[in-house]
Amino acid sequence: MNTNESALLIEIENYILEIYNRKSKPKDFYDDLSRLLIEFNGIYNSDYSYFGCIEAFVELLRELNICLGCQGELAQQLKNLSFKYIQCRFEFYVSRHKRKLRDHRYSENENTAQLVKRMRTVSQRYSRILVVRLDLAYKKKYHHSVDIADFDNDMRILRQRIHNQDGIFKGLIEYAWALEQGTEKGYHCHLLLVYKGHEHKNAYGIAERVSEIWKKITFNQGCYFNCHSPEYLNQFEEQGTLGIGMIHRNDPDQVGNMLKAIQYLVRPEKEEQYLRVKVCKRMRTFG
């Protein structure tokens, strides 16, 4: 695969939303639309489930009866469809897109509430817990060769290792993960691991060892961000909001900060982090 699937899907979504909001036909409208359709056709998989706006392109592909390899010919055929007609078609899918986004936000709120409940229970059960956070992604130079099936497969392997408590995962008392898609990061995962505080103390070291496992799973295409690096932790320590690392049950501020910090797992800074494609409708993005 030579196309960056993640970036293309975000570009298509932004394009459809832009066209939907236009008052008049933009310059090179048919050329841009034909280019995106051809690129989308190159990555399209009929077995996949596409989010919201992307479904508009799926329907257009089904209707077009010429070879999508010729952009000029496709642009000519698209000119038989007026800008207003295509804009109305997009409007239908944008409405569905907005409904799905509302459903997504509701699901995020539910996931957040469940995770907070689980972590509150853990913090009450143990006198101290070690909360480890890291982000797993792919090196930018490999984004063009990693599609949603690769990401799903890599995550399945990692989750199985966690579930089996192999190696560094031995002794886990709680864990959570969230799959996302971003403009810069591409496909990525926020990972939370929780250990008994009297058995483990080095959160940074654990995150580093997990990153090595991720690199092996991804054949060295994977990269990571260790949330326990001193530079990253210092900014939260200075603000008195540090909520990862060693958390003591008898310190209400630490527990409170921890419960706030873990919400980032399913509530990223930007709302546009949802997956635009899944290998199937029931593909899990949180657990």
Give residue ranges: language-model regions.
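Histidine-centered divalent-metal-coordination microenvironment in nucleic-acid enzymes
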Residues: E174-H198
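Signature for HUH/AEP ssDNA processing cores
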Residues: V116-A176
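"Short basic amphipathic alpha-helical interaction patches in structured regions
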Residues: I148-A149, L192, G205-E208
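Structured loops at beta-to-helix junctions and adjacent beta-edge loops in soluble globular domains
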Residues: D135-A137, E180, P268
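A short, flexible beta-alpha/helix-coil linker loop
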Residues: K139-H143, V194-E199
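Extended repeat-based interaction scaffolds and adjacent low-complexity, acidic/S/T/P-biased segments
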Residues: M1-Y85
